[in-house]
């Protein structure tokens, strides 16, 4: 017969939670670095969609 499963220990739970938070922190740091490079104008290694207002201003000049 099927037996009830054992409760996950607090240490295992904390370990999984720490891994999840670590991955989230790394993604947040990457997003912040990307945003900073776009705002500072140091974005040479990637492409991102331009706003329509910026395109209209460039077309008028």
Swiss-Prot record:
GO cellular component terms listed in the entry, alphabetical order: large ribosomal subunit
HAMAP family per the UniProt record, alphabetical: Ribosomal_bL32 (MF_00340)
Keywords, alphabetical: Ribonucleoprotein, Ribosomal protein
Biological source species: Gloeobacter violaceus (strain ATCC 29082 / PCC 7421)
Signal peptide: none
Basic residues composition bias: residue spans: 1-10
Region (Disordered) residue spans: 1-23
Family: Belongs to the bacterial ribosomal protein bL32 family.
GO MF annotation list: structural constituent of ribosome
Entry keyword Ribosomal protein: yes
Pfam families: Ribosomal_L32p
Name of the featured protein: Large ribosomal subunit protein bL32
Record GO biological process: translation
Domain of life: Bacteria
InterPro entries: Ribosomal_bL32 (IPR002677), Ribosomal_bL32_plant/cyanobact (IPR044958)
